[in-house]
Design a protein with these regions (language model features):
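Glycine-rich beta-strand-centered segment in the early N-terminal region that forms part
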Residues: 1-42, 82-85
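C-terminal hydrophobic helical "lid"/dimerization subdomain
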Residues: 143, 148, 196-200, 239-286
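Residue-level marker of beta-strand positions
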Residues: 7-9, 27, 43, 70, ...
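Rossmann-fold dehydrogenase core element
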Residues: 207-209, 219-259
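Cysteine-cluster motifs in flexible loop/terminal segments that predominantly coordinate metals
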Residues: 21, 32-79, 83
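Mid-domain Rossmann-like dinucleotide-binding core that forms the NAD(H)/NADP(H) cofactor-binding site
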Residues: 76-78, 83-167, 171-172
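Glycine-rich cofactor phosphate-binding loops and adjacent beta1-alpha1 units
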Residues: 108-113, 136, 151-230
Length: 286
C-alpha cells in the first residue's frame, strides 16, 4: 500500500531539534525530490538536485505521500510561502508548476523579442507555462490545443495566437511564422501525434522541448543534421527554480487554475480527473 501525493504544501506541525530557520506554523511548499545522500552527491552539489543520487518522491517510491493530514520530509526540501499566498494556492507548483517553469526558463534563454514560441497543450502544465513565458520574455506565444474550451480559457493568460487542432494546425502555425515555423516549440502532450506535429512546427535551428510523454519521437538523422533542430527533454525543476517560481507567484505573475476538494473527497477528485472534468489542477484540502 502507498499513500499518493507528491505535490505538497502546508503548515509545519513540528521540527527536529537540529532544524534552524523553520518553526511550527510556518507555511511551506515542498520540493518533491528527496536526496538519498542528504544533498552531498555531485548532482546536488552542482545544484542539479532533480538528478540527486538515490532520489525519491513522496507518494511514489516513498510510501508516505501528501494525501494525508501529516507528512514527514527533509528540511532541505522546504521553501517558505510568501505571506500573500496560502498552501492551497501553490501546492501544484511543486511539480506541475515547477516543470512548466523549468521548460519556460530554458526556452526564454534563447527567445528574442518578436520571435515565436508554440505551446502544445494548455491544460494543467500548459496554462502555467504560458504565464511563465509571458512574464519572462517578449516572444509571441502561439497556443495549440485540441479543446476549444481549453483554448478559450488559456488565451487570456498570455496567448498571442490560438490554433485549434483540426488537421490544419501545422499549416496555421507556419502562416503565423511567415512560413518558417517557431523558434521554440513546447510539447506538453507527447503522444497521439503531437511529437511529429511539434517537430514540423519547429523552425530550422529552433528547439523542440518535450515535456509530456507516451510515444516515440521519430525523426531521420539526416533531417536533424540538415535542419539543425534541437530536441530537449524536461524533468522537474530544481529547488532554486521552485524558489524563483514562488517569486513570480508572489508578484501575481503566475496563477493556478484549480478545483478544490476536501481530503475525504480524494476518490471523487481522481474520478473527475480521469473523466476530464478538472480544469487546471485538483487540490486536496485537509
Amino acid at each position: 500500500p502507498c499513500v499518493m501525493g507528491h505535490e505538497n504544501a502546508g503548515w509545519i506541525e513540528d521540527v527536529g531539534s537540529d532544524v534552524e530557520g523553520f518553526k511550527k506554523g510556518d507555511s511551506v511548499i515542498l520540493h518533491p525530490i528527496i536526496s538519498g545522500t542528504n544533498g552531498t552527491c555531485l548532482s546536488c552539489r552542482k545544484g542539479l538536485d532533480t538528478h540527486a543520487e538515490n532520489g525519491s518522491m513522496p507518494g511514489l517510491n516513498i510510501k508516505e505521500g501528501g494525501y494525508s493530514e501529516l507528512l514527514k520530509t527533509s528540511v532541505r526540501n522546504l521553501i517558505k510561502i510568501p505571506n500573500t499566498l496560502t498552501p492551497k494556492d501553490v501546492a501544484p507548483f511543486s511539480d506541475a508548476g515547477l516543470t512548466a517553469y523549468r521548460v519556460a526558463k530554458k526556452a526564454t534563454r534563447h527567445l528574442l523579442p518578436g520571435e515565436n514560441c508554440v505551446i502544445i497543450g494548455a491544460g494543467g502544465l500548459g496554462h502555467i507555462a504560458i504565464q511563465c513565458l509571458k512574464a519572462m520574455c517578449a516572444a509571441n506565444i502561439i497556443i495549440v490545443e485540441k479543446s476549444e474550451t481549453a483554448l478559450k480559457h488559456a488565451m487570456p493568460l498570455g496567448g498571442d495566437h490560438g490554433v485549434l487542432i483540426d488537421g490544419n494546425e501545422v499549416e496555421r502555425v507556419k502562416e503565423l511564422t511567415k512560413g518558417l515555423g517557431a523558434e521554440a516549440v513546447i510539447d506538453m502532450v507527447g503522444e497521439k501525434g503531437s511529437t511529429s506535429m511539434g517537430l514540423n512546427m519547429t523552425k530550422n535551428t529552433g528547439s523542440y522541448y518535450i515535456v509530456g510523454y507516451g510515444e516515440d519521437i521519430k525523426i531521420k538523422s539526416v533531417d536533424m543534421i540538415i535542419s539543425e533542430r534541437n530536441i530537449i527533454g524536461n524533468l522537474i525543476g530544481t529547488w532554486s527554480e521552485l524558489y524563483e517560481l514562488m517569486e513570480l507567484a508572489n508578484k501575481d505573475l503566475v496563477r493556478l487554475s484549480m478545483q478544490e476538494y476536501k481530503l475525504s473527497e480524494a476518490n471523487k477528485a481522481l474520478h473527475d480527473l480521469n473523466n476530464g472534468k478538472v480544469k487546471g489542477r485538483a487540490v486536496l484540502i485537509p
